Swiss-Prot record:
Protein's UniProt name: UPF0208 membrane protein SO_2914
Membrane topology: Multi-pass membrane protein
Principal location class: membrane
Lineage: superkingdom: Bacteria
An example Gene Ontology CC term for this record: plasma membrane
UniProt cross-references to InterPro entries, sorted A to Z: UPF0208
Protein family per UniProt: Belongs to the UPF0208 family.
Keywords tagged on the record: Cell inner membrane, Cell membrane, Membrane, Transmembrane, Transmembrane helix
Subcellular location(s) per record: Cell inner membrane
TM ranges: 40-60, 68-88
């Protein structure tokens, strides 16, 4: 079980780095907001965990050490929850509508001479993110304004 959780966290980290951070995709996919929130949480939550724990220990003394540790663990768990969701989403199979749209995008990239793998039968959101990342790097902005 713990290996599966670590694999899911790793998948979430990879998916977070792969997903193109383009505002237009935020209208269609929740990943844009989740990735932004998780990146912010990775930076801010450890500091908030230390501040909350230290302030509670300073105010109430060592008798409140269990409560201070609980608060610290809560703050530290927030970015992990984002990574777990992203990891779950990365391996989640694509719906047929997104599968067709991703295959059309892949075909358009291949027609332009850009090496891009078409999606297989077990395509997942991570595969779509790879295609989207290549597409946003190579296609002009007029294509994305049509969305």
């Amino acid at each position: 079980m713990s290996i599966n959780i670590l694999k899911t966290l790793g998948d979430g980290r990879r998916y977070m780095k792969t997903w193109p951070m383009v505002r237009q995709l935020g209208l269609y996919f929740p990943e844009y907001r989740v990735v932004r929130a998780t990146q912010l949480a990775i930076l801010v939550m450890p500091v908030l965990a230390v501040l909350a724990s230290v302030s509670q220990l300073y105010t109430y003394g060592w008798a409140f050490l269990p409560q201070a540790l609980t608060i610290a663990l809560f703050f530290i768990s927030l970015p992990l929850q984002g990574l777990l969701w992203l990891g779950w989403r990365a391996r989640h199979p694509l719906p047929l509508s997104l599968f067709d749209w991703s295959n059309q995008l892949s075909a358009k990239l291949t027609a332009m001479g850009i090496h891009c793998q078409s999606l297989g039968a077990k395509a997942c959101y991570l595969d779509m993110a790879l295609i989207l990342k290549i597409a946003f790097e190579r296609l002009d902005a007029s294509y994305w304004e049509e969305l």
